[in-house]
Regions:
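Conserved catalytic-site region of short-chain dehydrogenase/reductase
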Residues: 27-39, 63-69
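Short, surface-exposed alpha-helical segments at coil->helix boundaries
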Residues: 39, 43-46, 72-73, 132, ...
Length: 245
């Protein structure tokens, strides 16, 4: 579905002479040979969006933390509901979370800037932390006394069940997120966005928890339009010999 939507968008962008596509995805891990399906799908979407004439900038971001964020809501719900957290191996994976304000400013600088055309850009905070670190900092900022410790094994199925049950999040959202968090996702790219503010992870989490910040409403649907009844598919076909046709 992601590939088909990306292909439709790419076609529409070319048809409408769109000047620039900015696609926000996630940082890709260094161990590309064992990449999760979720992260591989993001990379494939990048390629499909860039398969035509419209310039594309793929913004690969660390965990974006801000008020109302879906990923951070999982963290706050776990801290709220679990006085004891036995954290599996994937919670020790390294990441560089980025403040929502910094992510938005990055996108603002990138849009329409030819220096970033057809280049992947990685953005993240200056601090390298683990998911367990984020849980602990969040617990302190929420003033919740929590016993958070690691266990030396990784059970993907149990992790999905545990996080989904106690975070109140849909399994379709939790499952790919857990799969991708087994990777270390730190910045690799040398192409950076300059002159950005830098907030500590503590400052970022504290602001994300601020209930006085008004969160913009998100549209729940679009007006129905009558489209032509066309059928199209995007196929994954391996090309081991790297031929062009």
């Amino acid at each position: 579905t992601d590939l088909l939507l990306a292909d439709n968008f790419s076609r529409a962008a070319q048809s409408c002479n769109l000047k620039h596509i900015v696609y926000v995805g996630g940082i890709l891990p260094k161990d590309n040979l064992n990449i999760s399906k979720h992260l591989l799908s993001r990379f494939e979407v990048e390629k499909v969006l860039g398969s035509r004439n419209t310039p594309v900038t793929a913004v690969r971001a660390g965990i974006i933390i801000g008020p109302g964020g879906s990923s951070f809501r999982i963290v706050t719900n776990l801290v709220k509901n679990l006085p004891v957290m036995a954290c599996p191996k994937w919670t020790k994976s390294k990441n560089q979370p980025i403040d929502l304000r910094v992510a938005l400013k990055s996108i603002h600088q990138i849009i329409g800037n030819k220096n970033y055309y057809n280049n992947p850009i990685e953005i993240g905070g200056s601090e390298v932390v683990t998911y367990m670190d984020i849980l602990k900092i969040t617990a302190r900022e929420m003033e919740k006394k929590r016993w958070i410790f690691s266990i030396p094994f990784f059970s993907l199925g149990m992790s999905k069940l545990w996080v989904g049950l106690f975070s109140g999040s849909n399994s379709n959202f939790v499952s790919p997120l857990i799969e991708s968090l087994r990777h270390d996702m730190t910045l690799n790219s040398k192409v950076i966005v300059k002159d950005l503010p830098d907030y500590s992870i503590k400052e970022t989490i504290k602001r994300a928890l601020d209930k006085n910040i008004k969160i913009p409403t998100v549209p729940t649907g679009l007006a129905q339009t009558k489209d032509k009844n066309t059928v199209r598919s995007v196929q994954r076909i391996s090309n081991p010999s790297k031929k062009t046709a």
